[in-house]
């Protein structure tokens, strides 16, 4: 009537494609056939951490949610094993450095005692000279020696036979130190939750095997440290006795020298 009406066949939606030869209409809204970008639900971790306590518990979850939860727990367990392994590796590194420092300390004790032996030789020559300086009419002087200076009791550290046998036994049992395990073949990319869980279990087995090896190494290190400390304690006691003997003889030599100078 007013000239505003058109035939229904000529109506077009605003978003209709101009190149649409099939006559179909493309609506402005998204259709169910178009792909939808799925963004991760950042609340999943919170749900998994509290065991679905806020959503009815495990019994109320779908099979898909339970599969995701199983994968999540498997990955968390793998992370825990890897963290323990990293801590154990750091402890082993610190233990190796400590053991090396102990060996160096033992070598220093050995060198110090060898210097005491050299001092004994020099002191013996000095005592002989002081005795000769008295002259033929003076009373002969003889230094007081309560013990001989025998030198160090320990030698540069060598692996003990017991340690070597222990190492051989561990290697026969397949427990020798070997770092991170690489025995597992490369696994294909998992296609479902079960395969992902099995893959994580394989990683956990490798990590636990490596952790067992490291703990064995730490036990051996602890035994070696204990043996080294015991040897050094005995060596220090022996060195202290020799130093006391040298100190007593030096005091006697000083008294003899002052007596000769007072004449």
UniProtKB/Swiss-Prot annotation:
Keywords in alphabetical order: Coiled coil, Cytoplasm, Membrane, Protein transport, Transport
One GO cellular-component annotation of the UniProt record comes to:
SNARE complex
Ranges of Polar residues composition bias in the record: 8-34, 52-61, 180-194
Q: Where in the cell is it found?
A: Membrane; Cytoplasm
Q: Which InterPro entries match?
A: NPSN/SNAP25-like_N_SNARE, T_SNARE_dom
Q: Looking at the record, which segments are called Disordered?
A: 1-61, 132-209
Q: Does the keyword rRNA processing apply?
A: no
> Where does the t-SNARE coiled-coil homology domain lie?
198-260
How does the entry describe its membrane topology? Peripheral membrane protein
Gene Ontology BP, a term: vesicle-mediated transport
Chief subcellular site?
A: membrane
User: Is the keyword Cell inner membrane in the record?
Assistant: no
Q: Which domain of life is it from?
A: Eukaryota
Which GO molecular function terms does the record list? Answer: SNAP receptor activity
User: Which spans does this entry mark as compositional bias, Basic and acidic residues?
Assistant: 158-173, 197-206
Its biological purpose? Vesicle trafficking protein that functions in the secretory pathway.
Q: Which family does it belong to?
A: Belongs to the SNAP-25 family.
Q: What is this protein called?
A: Putative SNAP25 homologous protein SNAP30
Record organism = Arabidopsis thaliana (Mouse-ear cress)
């Amino acid at each position: 009537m007013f000239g505003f009406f058109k035939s229904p066949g000529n109506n077009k939606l605003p978003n209709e494609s101009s190149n649409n030869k099939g006559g179909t209409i493309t609506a402005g809204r998204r259709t169910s056939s178009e792909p939808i970008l799925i963004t991760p639900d950042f609340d999943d971790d919170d749900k998994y951490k509290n065991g679905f306590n806020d959503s009815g518990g495990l019994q109320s979850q779908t099979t898909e949610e339970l599969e995701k939860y199983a994968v999540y727990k498997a990955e968390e367990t793998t992370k825990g094993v890897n963290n323990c392994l990293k801590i154990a590796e750091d402890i082993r590194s610190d233990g190796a450095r400590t053991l090396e420092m102990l060996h160096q300390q033992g070598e220093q004790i050995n060198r110090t005692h060898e210097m005491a032996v050299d001092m004994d030789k020099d002191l013996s020559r000095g005592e002989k000279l002081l005795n000769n300086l008295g002259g033929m009419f003076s009373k002969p002087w003889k230094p007081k020696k309560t013990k001989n200076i025998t030198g160090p009791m320990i030698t540069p550290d060598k692996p003990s036979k017991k340690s070597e046998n222990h190492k051989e036994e561990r290697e026969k049992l397949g427990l020798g130190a070997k770092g991170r395990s690489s025995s597992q073949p490369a696994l294909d990319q998992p296609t479902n939750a079960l395969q992902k869980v099995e893959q994580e279990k394989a990683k956990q087995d490798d990590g636990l095997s490596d952790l067992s090896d490291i703990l064995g190494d730490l036990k051996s290190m602890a035994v070696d440290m204990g043996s080294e400390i015991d040897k050094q304690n005995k060596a220090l006691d022996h060195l202290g006795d020799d130093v006391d003997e040298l100190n007593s003889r030096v005091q006697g030599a000083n008294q003899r020298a002052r007596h000769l100078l007072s004449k």
